[in-house]
Swiss-Prot record:
GO terms for cellular component: cytosolic large ribosomal subunit. It comes from Ralstonia pickettii (strain 12J). This is Large ribosomal subunit protein uL29. Keywords: Ribonucleoprotein, Ribosomal protein. Disulfide bonds: none annotated. Belongs to the universal ribosomal protein uL29 family. One of its GO terms (biological process) is translation. It holds the Pfam family Ribosomal_L29. Signal peptide: none annotated. One of its GO terms (molecular function) is structural constituent of ribosome. PANTHER family: 60S RIBOSOMAL PROTEIN L35/50S RIBOSOMAL PROTEIN L29, LARGE RIBOSOMAL SUBUNIT PROTEIN UL29C. PROSITE patterns: RIBOSOMAL_L29. InterPro entries: Ribosomal_protein_uL29, Ribosomal_uL29, Ribosomal_uL29_CS, Ribosomal_uL29_sf.
Length: 64
């Protein structure tokens, strides 16, 4: 997801997105641990999406 798309969302939507991404990251880590994960680049993509969401949340918090 692009940062510009995230900036259009409200704080509640961003928190929901962050929660979903964290759950996805947990699932991917479990798949990696049990050697069921085929595409390991998914971990990197999810980790960076989490960072984007947290960055936008921080920016919205500083605006107030």
């Amino acid at each position: 997801m692009k940062a510009s798309e995230l900036r259009d969302k409200d704080v509640a939507g961003l928190n929901q997105e962050l929660s979903e991404l964290l759950k996805a990251q947990f699932g991917l880590r479990m798949q990696k641990a049990t050697q069921q994960l085929q595409n390991t680049s998914q971990l990197k993509k999810v980790r960076r999406d989490i960072a984007r969401v947290r960055t936008v949340l921080g920016q919205k918090g500083n605006q107030k």
